[in-house]
Amino acid sequence: IVNAAVPPFGAWLPDAYPAATVTGAVFMSAFTTKTAVYALIRICAGSEILIVLGVVMAIYGVVYAVLENDARRLLAYHIISQVGYMVAGVGLGTQMAINGVVAHAFCHILYKSLLFMGTGSVLYMTGTAKLTELGGLYKTMPRTMIYTVIGGLSISSFPLFSGFVSKSMTVTA
């Protein structure tokens, strides 16, 4: 539960990502919360309390992400939200839901790593992760902008992107 960042036990997550190096943040994003989701699949798939916890996590993560000004903390709050989808899918416990959770975990590793690397390159080039201090970077960092937009569309479940497919599987279940 702690590793899955279930509120109130997930308070460590938004503080850990800004403190880590970019490569450390990518590694943590890829493995720490996903191992907890895997453990939940193995131990308590189909538990109704996980549905409630997953929905709470999804809402909690999005609300705090909207209020955040630091790019790395924003991505950390979105991890809580995305893992919330996965936890709710584990709680459903159907074959389709579990397949959707596994697909979403894999997709999440890909697009969240892309977003963290893009944020890391912006941090390296500008020296700040404050969103209010960034602007016009598409002129000086066009490739980073393209890759970050791809990651953003995927996390938003835009059609034809990986996040759309994996979240659709879980929602359909």
Description of each model-found segment:
Residues 1-173:
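Hydrophobic transmembrane alpha-helices and their helix-loop junctions in integral membrane proteins
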